[in-house]
């Protein structure tokens, strides 16, 4: 239903929380890290070229990992007392965004990069 925003956003969120806990962060800092990571995947299209989970999927997952590390570092250096956005609100927003997105941007290979990159590429 949510495509890449959900797949990569949720995995990045979980990784950010786990890393924060592993580095000695509090539970509230872990929630903050999860929120930060997920928030920055909202609205991401899911447009695999040729319907294959290669391009741009591999790079997007790599960027999700980097976002998880960055989110963890931000949360560890911040106080959850000052957070304006909660993980619950971001999860709700992701659900609403997924429902609002056009179907062709949800892993159909009918929009975005899938539409504009030729299938004849050897790399694909």
Regions from the language model: what does each represent?
Residues 1-4:
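Cysteine-centered functional microenvironments
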Residues 8-124:
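Functionally critical mobile loop/hinge segments
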């Amino acid at each position: 239903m949510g495509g890449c925003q959900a797949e990569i956003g949720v995995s990045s969120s979980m990784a950010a929380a786990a890393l924060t806990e592993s580095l000695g962060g509090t539970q509230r800092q872990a929630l903050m890290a999860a929120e930060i990571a997920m928030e920055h995947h909202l609205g991401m299209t899911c447009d695999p070229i040729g319907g294959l989970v290669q391009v741009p999927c591999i790079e997007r997952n790599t960027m999700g990992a980097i976002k998880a590390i960055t989110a963890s570092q931000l949360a560890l250096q911040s106080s959850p007392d000052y957070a304006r956005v909660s993980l619950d609100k971001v999860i709700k927003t992701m659900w609403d965004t997924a429902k609002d997105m056009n179907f062709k941007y949800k892993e159909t290979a009918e929009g975005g990069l899938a539409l504009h990159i030729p299938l004849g590429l050897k790399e694909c």
